[in-house]
Amino acid sequence: MKFTKMHGCGNDYIYVDGAREIIPAERKSEVVKFLSDRHFGIGGDGVIFINPSDVADFEMEMYNMDGSRSEMCGNGIRCVGKYVYDHGLTRKTSLSIVSCGKIKYLELSVEDGRVTKVRVNMGSPVLEAADIPMDISALKDYKAVYKDILSNAKHTGLSKVAVKALSEVTNAVVAEKIEVNGGIYEITGVSMGNPHGIVYLDKDIDIKKFAIEQIGPHFESHMAFPERVNTEFIQVVDKNNLNMRVWERGSGETLACGTGACASLVATVLNGMCDTTATLHL
């Protein structure tokens, strides 16, 4: 099998041309788990097959390290853009990529015949709990905190974009209580094509020493998330800077997560803790 190993900000995947390397559907999960193993395989956060498509320029068929399917990966789709251009599969610099029925649009920057940058329109965040999906009955006494945030928006200076977004949902999960492994946390739910739960850490915690490997799996499999969840642990430095660590469903801790970065900024804006433009430090 021919493959290409690529990463975006350390979020590494194994990329395979699905039109040339034909793997039976029933064997893909097994093959992905073998290839992703960092000791006995190639090693990566998962495998991405790049396939032909009737509705977009290409299809991204993404799998997590554990062999499960995933809907979207911000870093992964950027690498797909570079792959298809650098491998001569297209000469277009404006691309459409479909994954699980959802189309994203890419803009490629090319220098000396090679892609140097890829910009992706990740689309609008999904805040409706049922569509993330989240089961609000599994939270600890859901209080629709977002309604209080809306009613106090004029006094707190909540951004207009946050006010508009929260005004359009029936049940949003913003700063709601959740019990995980005996502890009580505040969580905000966002989907960027895949489900995310954003949790905030105190400023006095050393985020680099935070035991994400112990608590991450408990969030991932919590009953509030019927399709499991990617969990971002965020530390607000100031209104323009956030520290982030991420536990991805099916892959564990990863060095970066593009959809997670987007979801974290959205959540932090909704909570009134940062501006609509900020830098996330991984």
Model feature map: region roles:
Residues S99-Y200:
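ATP-dependent small-molecule kinase catalytic core of the GHMP/sugar-kinase superfamily
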Residues M1-R114, G197-L282:
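A glycine-rich beta-to-alpha transition motif near the start of alpha/beta enzyme domains, typified by
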